[in-house]
């Protein structure tokens, strides 16, 4: 199986890394504390909690980079998409440097907020990748679902300890819609333009019409005489 056929697997891994990173970042410390108390009857070391926080952020960022790489490989000849991915990387790097100077960044990292800005800044580029109005509105709807689930519904569920909420299904639905839209590349030519066939196909189709090169059996020659 070629690497291109494995892109859905990498896409699924990227989505899993994003969801796992969010879970580890916001719920990992609580889970680790409960497990540590039940097993050792003691509080969790501070370094373990910090490791849990930063591991979640690392997974989150790796997931976004994986998703961007998969979409880029599916549309590697599209300069707009390539520029949008590079722009998002630059924006996230600059934003990280600026927020790192704040004291609150150490105790409450804001890196997940960067992904929201990356999504919004990428909307124009993503919309430009599609020619049809239906695809454009589908992309906008998927982006709204992802932002709503990740920054409204999921934080609300964590705040009120809602276990079986709709946040995670909404997040998965948004990513699934985006994948379905971008799973089929854009046609390289506008609608209505005839695409020339390869030379070998023309030769095969035109072979019966090439009477000069056709060898006539002797029986047919006798009938002609």
Swiss-Prot record:
Give any Gene Ontology cellular component.
Answer: host cell membrane
User: Where is this gene product found?
Assistant: Host membrane
The residue range of the signal peptide is none
Q: Could you tell me the keywords of this UniProt record?
A: Host membrane, Membrane, Transmembrane, Transmembrane helix
Q: Membrane-spanning regions, if any?
A: 2-22, 53-73, 80-100, 111-131, 136-156, 162-182
State the membrane topology.
Answer: Multi-pass membrane protein
Which superkingdom heads the taxonomic lineage of this protein's source?
A: Viruses
Q: What is this protein called?
A: Transmembrane protein 022L
Taxonomically, what lineage is the organism?
Viruses, Varidnaviria, Bamfordvirae, Nucleocytoviricota, Megaviricetes
